[in-house]
UniProtKB/Swiss-Prot annotation:
GO terms for molecular function: alpha-mannosidase activity; carbohydrate binding; metal ion binding. This is Alpha-mannosidase 2C1. Co(2+) binds at residues 259, 261, 371, 576. Signal peptide: none annotated.
Length: 1040
């Protein structure tokens, strides 16, 4: 052994070892340069296609000679390479690799099956042809390499999140056969880890110096040109790593993981190939490392692979049986945690868990959502209702203002449901097994002393890639060595089981898990948000009418297969980079096409159900109006009269979950006792609308100067202020353009001033009064709006059309209220949250832009003002000002985001008493669910009919559908929730022929103790605050 000098300098010793393993410096004489030995060329041919062809079709194409250095492209095309190789006889007994480096993402095909992904960005640049070449092995072989013209994270022009460069070209830089020296690889791993220990523990730690001196001795012993020196060097490393830690060492549970965004900086179709590249690589690793477990979420991606790569899918199922491939999450996709409705969140689990049960024999026990932009306070209840009590995520480590205080804790939801939550303390779902990451997992843990276990997700992610053999080798060496936490390769189930054993001292977080970042995603790509809201409602209506038709018609077949397809499209669009608008233009276009598919087929199914529902009943031909919520509706609706299709208004009353005939010219109801709408335009150009419930005054530019609750004379608009005030903000974030709106945007507020004289009267009163105006927002953008007040309606509507052509601007509308309150209320899934004024401490201040669904409310003791909407999500309440976020104009990753024409409606509702007493929730449902007017193909009923009603206004009947596993196809599922935040006993009335009623969970599994007795066509139900309850109703066969 070479003698070490008496004194050693820490830095020079450290850097000496660094250079010995460097892939950049001194590779002509260092160890890294010996990783590969002898090599030989391969014969290449290729063909280029704009399509993503299946293997069977691709290999039939005409291939032309190709060589290293060739360029191909452009972006989103595919280049297929035929690789013909001959392995030299002298390589028998050696490990042989195909070395491949190219721009883009590659997939190796062997014998017609995908076998491994190759991507420079994912540190996968060689494919193992043989771990030890045998004399009997074939020497000649033909492989195919499918190269996608996009990188692991898309093809952004100039930066990762920039819009894709459509002209980008790609190049093949290496293709050869080479002998791989596994002993060199092992030494490189040892030395890298020793350097990591030395650096991570620092110069004041004895074990740090021990690691550094061990590495130095290895360099002294190891001559890269003489492999016979390697074993002695490796023995020094083994001795170091063989020194065990104490019993109190923290245990890290390392799980292989490959986060693949279902669409983001690449289109949906490319994700299918990303799955094949990533998961075929994981299969090879599972074959070579029997202790390695790989967690995989998102049923949609598995279904894609099942359909397009059946051989690979069969391997995944086999490794699932062995316990190495572990399905997690339980959802169809890793959805956004804010914007989807409560019912849509339930369907994520319903579709996902049923898929995992059918395909892998069991449901998931962990909810897995590592990357999303916030977490609704109703998720714990939804998880528990779907058989899940464990939750893993890490996105809150991105918080901009406040550091979240826990990594392992209980999360208590809106109704009191609790789940065990773990954030891997390394603050990443894409670890690589370095010492730095392992140490951070311990030092960064905010629950030290409460639990001695942590998760560690390793593998390249976001764009796929997944784990590598090098990552596994690192983690194995760190299994139990002094100075480091214990590392064991575990499954998510093993991690949570260990955490549950230590859960007695864990803290509890109550309410929403709010991400203090990415709050621009509540508004970006407004058309995607609108499509989401509309399609959620269309599917609600199709299920409702189909269920009622099923109950009343023996001939009607519930469209279960069609509805599953449409629901899965909607759930796909609710992926956390799609509905949020943080995706490229190609993805947004695909999503809009999916919405159109849902609309088109949904409306066809609606018409079929309506026709079946009333078939055979006596009455005149014409229209029927359907009420699709459990509330009686009194609405002014348009009725088409005459051959020319002229529209006139009529007042219609439709019962809860039922229908009524449309009025004819001879059956129009008198207005009394309701007061007709009064409209007056003053000489100064202002307009007053009054329906006896509220009185609205607009100034000549269309701003709201007064909103009075007539019965009390109470003014809702702050003195001297203007409501319906459009405001424009500069909107330039720090980096994440489509994602972020920063706090400083509030400092750039600019009111958009209209011109006096643009306000004109529209509808002149009676059943409806309105006024409209035009507003030039900027030289490039304009707005038109009709302000509408209907007879008997407690709110005024603002029908808005915007032509928007801006760059980094943010449009909002504001309503200063004559209300003083320290907190506002925001609707969320199956309930609401109350949040403090964001001008208080940092946890509130970070909520300067928040999300809500259909309404927000600001109330004091006996009066309040609610702001409703039909397709918006971003909002805020600062002081007494209610604000609705309308449109943004980011330029990355989609330069076209939000550009063009938009239509939307919001409404303002002053009210006496609390929002619960005033019926704000019902009003928001009415705004979002206008009466369905469907033609009667034959005789239509001339009487009203109601299928269900609920005795308490606090309980909302949200969903009526056929049960997923209805053996006789005669079982309905009803989902109800308590919306006021109160304990409620109520009656559910039904006119349907119910034979049996039972409580069930959200997966529609019967509660064995949940039998409900039917009394006079009524069921008694009990709710705690914000509780969601589901019922199974078995129907008697209809008479016809």
């Amino acid at each position: 052994m070479a003698a070490a000098p008496f004194l050693k300098h820490w830095r020079t010793t450290f850097e000496r070892v660094e250079k010995f393993v460097s892939p950049i410096y001194f590779t002509d004489c260092n160890l890294r340069g010996r990783l590969f030995g002898d090599s030989c060329p391969v014969t290449l041919s290729s063909f280029l296609t704009p399509e993503r062809l299946p293997y069977e079709k691709a290999v039939q194409q005409n291939f032309s000679p190709a060589q290293v250095g060739d360029s191909f492209g452009p972006t989103w095309w595919t280049c297929w390479f035929r690789v013909e190789l001959v392995i030299p006889e002298v390589w028998v007994g050696k490990e042989v690799h195909l070395c491949w480096e190219s721009d883009g993402e590659s997939l190796v095909w062997r014998d017609g099956e995908p076998v491994q992904g190759l991507t420079k960005e994912g540190e996968k640049t060689s494919y193992v042809l043989s771990e030890r070449l045998h004399a009997a092995d074939p020497r000649s072989l033909t492989l195919y390499v499918e190269v996608a013209c996009n990188g692991l994270l898309g093809a952004g022009k100039g930066s990762m999140i920039a819009a894709p460069d459509p002209e980008k070209m790609f190049q093949l830089s290496q293709a050869k056969l080479a002998v791989f020296h596994r002993d060199v690889h092992n030494l490189l791993v040892d030395l890298e880890l020793l350097l990591g220990v030395a650096k991570g523990l620092g110069e004041d730690n004895q074990r740090s110096f021990q690691a550094l001196y061990t590495a130095n001795q290895m360099v002294n012993i190891c001559d890269p040109a003489q492999p016979e020196t390697y074993p002695a060097a490796e023995a020094l490393a083994s001795k170091f790593f063989g020194q065990r830690g104490g019993e109190s060492q923290h245990t890290i549970h390392a799980t292989g993981h490959c986060h693949i965004d279902t669409a983001w900086l690449w289109p949906f179709k490319e994700t299918v190939r990303k799955c094949a590249r990533s998961w075929s690589t994981a299969v090879k690793l599972m074959e070579r490392n029997t202790e390695f477990t790989f967690a995989c979420s998102q049923a949609q991606q598995l279904e894609w692979v099942k359909n397009q790569y059946p051989g690979l899918y069969a391997q995944l199922q086999e490794f699932a049986c062995r316990g190495q491939f572990v399905p997690v999450g339980g959802t169809w996709v890793e959805m956004d945690g804010n914007l989807p409705s409560g019912e849509a969140m339930v369907r994520q689990f319903l579709q996902g868990q049923n898929f995992f049960l059918q395909e892998f024999g069991k449901m998931c026990s962990e909810f897995w959502l590592p990357d999303t932009f916030g977490y609704s306070a109703q998720l714990p209840q939804i998880m528990q209702g779907c058989g899940i009590k464990r939750f893993l995520t890490q996105k809150l480590s991105w918080n901009l203002v406040n550091s979240f205080p826990h990594h392992t804790f209980f999360w208590e939801g809106l109704d009191g449901s609790q789940v065990l939550v773990h954030f891997p303390p390394g603050d990443s779902y894409g670890m690589q097994g370095s010492v730095e990451e392992v140490l951070k997992t311990v030092t960064n843990n905010r629950d030290k002393g409460r639990t001695n276990h942590s998760g560690f997700l390793f593998g390249f992610g976001d764009g796929g890639g997944g784990p590598t053999q090098t990552m596994l080798d690192r983690l194995k060496r760190l299994g139990n060595t002094d100075g480091q936490p214990r590392v064991q390769l575990s499954s998510p189930g093993q991690l949570f089981t260990a955490l549950e054993r230590d859960s007695g001292q864990l803290c509890t977080w109550v309410g929403e898990l709010f991400l203090e970042l990415h709050n621009g995603t509540y508004t970006t790509h407004a058309q995607l948000k609108k499509g989401n809201r509309e399609c959620e409602q269309i599917l609600h209506d199709v299920e409702l009418l189909s269920s009622l038709a099923l109950a009343r018609s023996a001939q009607f077949l519930y469209p279960a297969v069609q509805l599953q397809r449409l629901w899965r499209l909607l759930l796909l669009n609710q992926f956390h980079d799609v509905v949020t608008g943080s995706c490229i233009q190609l993805v947004a276009e695909d999503a809009m096409n999916y919405y159109e598919d849902i609309r088109s087929h949904g409306n066809t199914l609606l018409s079929a159900a309506a026709a079946a529902l009333c078939a055979g009943e006596p009455g005149p031909k014409g229209l029927r109006h359907y009420q699709h919520t459990a509330l009686e509706a009194h609405r002014s609706v348009g009725t088409t009269q005459g051959l020319v299709g002229l529209t006139r208004l009529a007042l219609v009353t439709v019962p809860s979950i039922g229908y009524a005939p449309a009025p004819t010219p001879t059956s129009l109801q008198p207005l009394l006792p309701q007061q007709p709408v009064f409209v007056m335009q003053e000489t100064d150009g202002s307009v007053t609308l009054d329906n006896g419930i509220i009185r609205v005054r607009l100034d000549p530019t269309g701003c709201l100067t007064s909103l009075v609750l007539v019965a009390s004379g109470r003014e809702a608009i702050a003195e001297g202020a203007l409501g319906n005030q459009f405001v424009l903000f500069d909107d330039v974030p720090l980096y994440w353009d489509a994602w972020d709106v920063m706090d400083y945007h509030l400092e750039t507020r600019k009111p958009v001033r209209g011109q006096a004289g643009t306000l004109a009267v529209g509808a002149e009163g009676g059943l409806r009064g309105s006024a409209w105006f035009l507003l030039q927002i900027s030289p490039n953008s304009r707005l038109s709006q009709e302000v509408v007040l209907d007879v008997g309606c407690p709110y005024v509507r603002f029908h808005t059309e915007v032509h928007w052509h801006e760059t980094h601007k943010f449009l909002k509308v504001e309503f200063p209220a004559r209300v003083r309150s320290p907190q506002a209320t925001y609707e969320i899934q199956f309930g609401h949250l109350q949040e403090a004024d964001p001008q208080q401490h940092s946890w509130d201040w970070a909520r300067y832009e928040v999300w809500a669904h259909r309404w927000i409310d600001l109330s004091e003791c006996d009066f309040g003002l609610a702001l409703l909407n039909n397709c918006k999500y971003g909002t805020s309440v600062r002081g007494n000002v209610l604000s609705l976020s309308l449109l943004r104009a980011p330029k990355a990753p989609d330069v076209t985001a939000d550009m063009g024409r938009h239509e939307f409606t919001y409404a303002l509702m002053p009210h006496k008493g609390s929002f619960q007493e005033a019926g704000v929730i019902q009003a928001a449902y009415n705004l979002n669910f206008p009466l369905l007017a469907l033609p009667a193909p034959g005789p239509a009923p001339d009487t009203t009919w109601s299928a269900f009603s609920v005795s308490s206004p606090a309980v909302v009947l949200e969903t009526i559908k056929q049960a997923e596993k209805s053996h006789q196809h005669r079982t309905l599922v009803l989902r109800l929730y308590e919306a006021h935040g109160s304990h409620v006993d109520c009656w559910l009335h039904t006119s349907l022929p119910v034979q049996e009623a039972t409580l069930c969970d959200l997966l529609e599994q019967r509660d064995p103790t949940g039998h409900l007795s039917l009394q006079d066509n009524r069921l008694k139900l009990t709710f705690s605050p914000f509780q969601v309850r589901s019922l199974l109703l078995v129907l008697q066969p209809p008479a016809n």
